[in-house]
């Protein structure tokens, strides 16, 4: 359900019901309504006609209804809104994703399907739109602006510029331009970014930002280009600067370690701005099921000391204003009846969820299972690669046979840094130093036949086996980490055979694998089964790497190729510098020594 069109007849029935001239279709009585406009909690009855809230009135004053539900003093909130999400991070198709989040109280999402778009182009966005049709989740899609995120430094499955953006922005299901990740292109006036921004501005729809690390004049220039939001907050000071600059903040749940600092900064303000919203950005399937999506973030913010009414306003009224949806975000006559019942404001847990006036979920369970749209074919067979051999995973220095070489390499995971080291070379092959591992990237979209790219990694520990994934931001090429070439080839070939996903290998065996045959990033499995497989993969990864829980393994791999961010990253085109936007030769020097 992208929109719900209220017919003239339905609206006129609502008018008459509000006047007591017709019965309501549904009357929710004795509700503790959370008023997002005033911050009050008021005891009221709420009358619903069709998909529309017809009346919010004192308890017992209008009682005629075809159906009545006594809420017995439970809290009633507007449906929750996620202002920025990549559904693909759940590795679930839209109908499976909707089953989880709707039951948790999320009724609207703003989906940036740029993961699908980077594999499939405009067809990937069309799949997102069509596969979401008919679901009890209001899916507003964004037109991805970052396909690829850094042209010239990576190659994805498509290239988007002005024409593609205009095509997608003309679709009624598309609500704006998705996060503008090519900050460098915006600030330097690249023709491609001018076309993309102009398409957004001319459409009258919103333009999402990705202002990671921007400050001062650069931040001001980024806003002047037309961007109006940011979810890439890095500190409390960063959040305040961006809020003062005029950006809508999208506090995200995928970086919970930052929440205490951000909340502390917000508490220094005279009041919490309507420019503050919340988003999930990326949530893996096991965490989505176990802890929740937006509702998990709201509970974390409450734990940090923000009033529940303020936190809920971020996820309802503020979010609706951000998404230019005056029909959502308030429990008021004339608004769509997307409603959530909570039994407590200390720990939010949805007891009932109403979508467009219909009871859709109760006690965390959907009233009925959701089915995939039978008229939409899920995209498959997107890993256009032949089987690989162990020799494809060897870092070489062709200029010498035996000797030493000084190489640039990637240091760190969350925020990568440049470093260099001198290595032994035997028979033209680099001997991986103790404490180092390899990262390997291969283009998988069939658009070029470049050889695999390899680089050294420092600060990740020594991998005892290999980890492979076809889900790696943002071009989603095939990525493998490890030290042993045979294990790396084994993990990569497991994904090529299954159509994508994630795999762990060690000592010639596949320890764990999650197949994702839909675009190399979505699974066919039921959500609970996928979550269990993903958790098993996460747990078994401890045999391969001594990394921080709970999911640094996957977040780190996914981010190692994110060339739009500052620092070194490896892509299918080589070792890149996110600051200078250049491809860098990893070889600094090499020299022969006696064998």
UniProtKB/Swiss-Prot annotation:
EC number(s) recorded for this UniProt protein: 3.5.4.2
Catalytic activity reads: adenine + H2O + H(+) = hypoxanthine + NH4(+)
State the needed cofactors, names only.
Mn(2+)
UniProtKB keywords = Hydrolase, Manganese
Alphabetically, the GO molecular function entries are: adenine deaminase activity
Enzyme class, UniProt record, top EC level: hydrolase
- Its domain of life reads Bacteria
Name a biological process GO annotation: adenine catabolic process
The family note in this entry says: Belongs to the metallo-dependent hydrolases superfamily. Adenine deaminase family.
Quaternary context: Homodimer.
- This chain's protein is named Adenine deaminase
Organism, as annotated: Serratia proteamaculans (strain 568)
Q: Which gene encodes it?
A: ade
């Amino acid at each position: 359900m992208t929109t719900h069109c209220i017919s003239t007849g339905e609206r006129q029935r609502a008018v008459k019901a509000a006047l007591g001239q017709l019965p309501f279709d549904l009357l929710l009585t004795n509700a503790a309504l959370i008023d997002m406009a005033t911050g009050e909690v008021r005891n009221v009855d709420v009358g619903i006609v069709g998909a529309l809230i017809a009346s919010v009135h004192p308890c017992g004053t209008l009682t005629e209804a075809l159906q009545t539900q006594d809420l017995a003093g439970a809290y009633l909130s507007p449906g929750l809104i996620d202002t920025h999400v990549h559904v693909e991070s759940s590795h679930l198709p839209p109908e499976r994703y909707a089953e989880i989040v709707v039951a948790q109280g999320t009724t609207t999402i703003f989906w940036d399907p740029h993961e699908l778009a980077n594999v499939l182009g405009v067809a990937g966005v069309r799949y997102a739109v069509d596969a979401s049709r008919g679901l009890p989740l209001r899916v507003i899609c964004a037109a991805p602006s970052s396909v690829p995120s850094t042209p010239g430094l990576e190659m994805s499955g498509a290239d988007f510029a002005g024409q593609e953006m205009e095509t997608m922005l003309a679709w009624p299901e598309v609500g704006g331009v998705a996060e503008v990740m090519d900050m460098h292109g915006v600030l330097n006036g690249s023709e491609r970014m001018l076309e993309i921004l102009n398409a957004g501005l001319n459409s009258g729809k919103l333009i999402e930002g990705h202002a990671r690390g921007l400050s001062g004049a650069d931040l001001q220039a980024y806003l002047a280009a037309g961007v109006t939001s940011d979810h890439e907050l890095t500190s409390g000071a960063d959040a305040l600067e961006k809020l003062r600059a005029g950006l809508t903040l999208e506090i995200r749940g995928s970086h919970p370690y930052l929440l205490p600092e951000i909340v502390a900064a917000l508490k220094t303000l005279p009041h919490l701005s309507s420019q503050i919203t919340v988003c999930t950005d990326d949530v893996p399937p096991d965490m989505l099921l176990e802890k929740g999506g937006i509702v998990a973030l709201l509970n974390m913010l409450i734990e940090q000391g923000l009033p529940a009414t303020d936190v809920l306003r971020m996820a309802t009224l503020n979010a609706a204003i951000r998404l230019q949806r005056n029909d959502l975000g308030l429990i008021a006559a004339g608004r769509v009846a997307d409603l959530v019942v909570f039994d407590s404001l200390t720990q939010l847990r949805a007891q009932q969820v109403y979508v467009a006036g219909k009871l859709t979920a109760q006690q965390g369970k959907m009233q009925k299972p959701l089915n995939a749209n039978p008229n939409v074919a899920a995209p498959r067979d997107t890993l256009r690669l032949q089987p690989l051999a162990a020799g494809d995973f060897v870092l070489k220095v062709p200029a010498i046979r035996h000797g030493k070489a000084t190489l640039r390499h990637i240091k760190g995971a969350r925020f990568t840094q440049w470093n260099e080291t001198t290595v032994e070379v035997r028979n033209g092959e680099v001997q991986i130093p103790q404490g180092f591992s390899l990262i390997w990237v291969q283009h998988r979209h069939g658009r070029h036949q470049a050889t695999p790219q390899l680089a050294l990694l420092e600060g990740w520990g020594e991998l005892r086996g290999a980890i492979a994934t076809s889900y790696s931001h943002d071009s989603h090429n095939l990525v493998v980490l490890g030290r042993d070439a045979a294990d790396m080839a084994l993990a990569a070939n497991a994904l090529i055979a299954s159509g994508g996903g994630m795999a762990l290998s060690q000592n010639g065996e596949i320890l764990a694998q999650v197949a994702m045959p839909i675009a190399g990033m979505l699974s066919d499995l039921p959500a609970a089964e996928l979550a269990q497989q993903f958790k098993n993969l996460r747990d078994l990864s401890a045999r391969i790497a001594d990394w921080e829980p709970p999911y640094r393994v996957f977040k780190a791999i996914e981010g190692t190729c994110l060339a739009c961010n500052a620092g070194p990253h490896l892509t299918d085109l080589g070792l890149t510098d996110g600051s200078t936007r250049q491809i860098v030769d990893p070889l600094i020097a090499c020299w022969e020594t006696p064998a």
